[in-house]
Amino acid sequence: MYTVDNTADHDECMSMLADAGIYLALDVNTPKYSLNRGDPGPSYNKVYLQSLFATVDAFANYDNTLLFFSGNEVINDDKTTPAAPYVKAVTRDLRQYIGSRGYRKIPVGYSAADVESNRFEMAQYMNCGTDDQRSDFYAFNDYSWCDPSSFTQAGWDQKVKQYGDYSIPLL
């Protein structure tokens, strides 16, 4: 789910999803509160973090909340790569917040744009550091395997080889 209203009551929806066996993967950012990829420093502030924490509070107690994305395609080209430390800080802050509130361990990670020039470096960066700093998982949005394509035409054979020893789950 890309965005939610963290002030609304989601009990009915989450109950219907649970009844259907559906788990929620939720981006905690919203159109109003998100990192500005071009100039992330000013957007990473107390008001922004409080919005993210409100989203965690709204969804952490649902058993079918599967995971939280700390960001989605914030880094979408070489020019926006300097936003990476801010995404990593959001991951850290969310993990610490979840722990401090006594919520169950809910995985937090990043969903990346499939930018060939920094794809692997971003995956490595999000997986380095202390347990509090690094992602619980790493996802990348890859649209290369669209019909008519194949495992090799889409380049997935090379991706599987490159990420073969990656130590956190890839989504």
What are these language model-derived features?
Residues 80-171:
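Noncatalytic carbohydrate-binding groove/subsite architecture in carbohydrate-active enzymes
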Residues 1-11, 33-35, 43-46, 76-77, ...:
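Acidic-and-aromatic substrate-binding clefts and catalytic sites of carbohydrate-active enzymes
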Residues 15, 50-57, 63, 85-92, ...:
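Solvent-exposed, polar/charged alpha-helical surfaces in well-ordered, non-transmembrane soluble domains
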Residues 53-83, 109-111:
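Active-site groove signature of glycoside hydrolases
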Residues 1-40, 88-109:
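Aromatic-lined substrate-binding rim segments of carbohydrate-active enzymes
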Residues 10-24, 54-64, 125-133, 160-165:
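Acidic (Asp/Glu)-rich catalytic clusters
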Residues 1-2, 24-28, 66-70, 108-110, ...:
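Hydrophobic faces of well-ordered beta-strands that scaffold small-molecule active sites
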Residues 32, 36-38, 47-54:
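Aromatic/His-enriched, Gly/Pro-containing loop or helix-boundary segments
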